[in-house]
């Protein structure tokens, strides 16, 4: 006898929780696969679940039990109101990074500016900026060719005209004069490995997560490279780790003594943004 949707989902959720996993993950994956919102779920939850859907759910459940990220299972993640393709070559976009995008947009109008996003990954930052500011010239750089392939797919799917470059830091565009530098670079130190969720440690690309010199290496590189490229009134927007505020304040102040350096907190009250304006 076929089981009803809510019975299967309740069982799956409880099973995950009994294994110490996030029970809601299976609900999220199921609703995304069905294309249902919460209202549609309430309308259909008492209906019988077809056998093939139950088999798919059990396959997804087995993956979630190994800490495989739900976003990789689905091949997509939501960011700043848009759906982005993701895979194991890209970091999964985080809600905290939306605050970086929001802060940059709030401070800069839709006038012709040259904007460079370093370590673009899925292209989430670059694409979100371009869609919100069509007059900006947005350049996106990544060291991973596989990540750039995904970023290009996202830009095309969402209709964002981005210039993409493969390379290290700002080197691919060293001759440019830029108005805005924005980056969410690898900033986790090896000592912080134990703080990461198992799903992040196991499946997300380590080159997009970890950096040498207590997680500061990429900031040091970008700040150094930007000094010959950033226009006199140019601005810098970095996402940072929660323990890096003081270090970024010092690095940016030393390189740009004429600018106002701000360390701003995220919605959780942790240092999250380093800004030079």
Curated annotation (Swiss-Prot):
Q: State where substrate binds.
A: 184-187
Q: What residues does S-adenosyl-L-methionine bind to?
A: 119-123, 142, 184
Q: What is its EC number?
A: 2.1.1.297
Task: Enumerate the UniProt keywords alphabetically.
Answer: Methyltransferase, S-adenosyl-L-methionine, Transferase
Q: Which InterPro entries does the UniProt entry name for this protein? A: DNA_methylase_N6_adenine_CS (IPR002052), HemK-like (IPR004556), N5-glutamine_MTase (IPR050320), PrmC_N (IPR040758), RF_methyltr_PrmC (IPR019874), SAM-dependent_MTases_sf (IPR029063), Small_mtfrase_dom (IPR007848)
Cysteine-cysteine disulfides: none
Which terms under GO biological process does the entry name?
methylation
On whether Transferase is a keyword of this UniProt record, the answer is yes
First-tier enzyme category under EC? transferase
Query: Can you state which reaction this protein catalyses?
Result: L-glutaminyl-[peptide chain release factor] + S-adenosyl-L-methionine = N(5)-methyl-L-glutaminyl-[peptide chain release factor] + S-adenosyl-L-homocysteine + H(+)
Q: Which GO terms describe its molecular function?
A: nucleic acid binding; protein-(glutamine-N5) methyltransferase activity; protein-glutamine N-methyltransferase activity
Among the Pfam families in the record, one is MTS
Looking up HAMAP family in the UniProt record yields:
RF_methyltr_PrmC (MF_02126)
Name the job this protein performs: Methylates the class 1 translation termination release factors RF1/PrfA and RF2/PrfB on the glutamine residue of the universally conserved GGQ motif.
Question: What does the similarity note say?
Answer: Belongs to the protein N5-glutamine methyltransferase family. PrmC subfamily.
Q: State the name under which the record lists this protein.
A: Release factor glutamine methyltransferase
Q: Give the gene symbol.
A: prmC
């Amino acid at each position: 006898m076929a089981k009803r949707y809510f019975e299967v989902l309740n069982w799956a959720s409880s099973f995950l929780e009994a294994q110490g996993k996030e029970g809601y993950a299976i609900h999220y994956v199921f609703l995304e696969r069905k294309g249902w919102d919460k209202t549609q779920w309430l309308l259909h939850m008492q209906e019988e679940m077809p056998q093939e859907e139950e088999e798919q759910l059990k396959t997804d459940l087995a993956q979630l039990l190994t800490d495989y990220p739900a976003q990789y299972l689905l091949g997509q993640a939501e960011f700043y109101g848009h759906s982005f393709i993701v895979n194991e070559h890209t970091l999964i976009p985080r809600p905290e990074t939306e605050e970086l995008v929001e802060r940059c947009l709030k401070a800069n109008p839709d006038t012709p500016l040259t904007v460079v996003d370093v370590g673009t990954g899925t292209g989430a930052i670059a694409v979100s900026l371009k869609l919100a500011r069509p007059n900006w010239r947005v350049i996106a750089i990544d060291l991973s060719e596989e990540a750039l392939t995904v970023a290009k797919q996202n830009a095309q799917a969402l209709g964002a005209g981005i210039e993409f470059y493969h390379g290290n830091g700002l080197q691919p565009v060293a001759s440019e004069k830029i108005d805005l530098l924005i980056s969410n670079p690898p900033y986790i130190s090896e000592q912080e490995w134990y703080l990461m969720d198992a799903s992040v440690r196991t499946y997300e690309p380590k080159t997009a997560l970890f950096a040498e010199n207590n997680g500061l290496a990429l900031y040091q590189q970008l700040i150094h490279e930007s000094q010959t490229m950033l226009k006199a009134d140019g601005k810098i927007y970095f996402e940072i780790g929660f323990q890096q505020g003081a270090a970024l304040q010092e690095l940016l102040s030393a390189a740009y003594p004429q600018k106002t350096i701000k360390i701003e907190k995220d919605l959780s009250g942790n240092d999250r943004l380093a800004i030079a304006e």
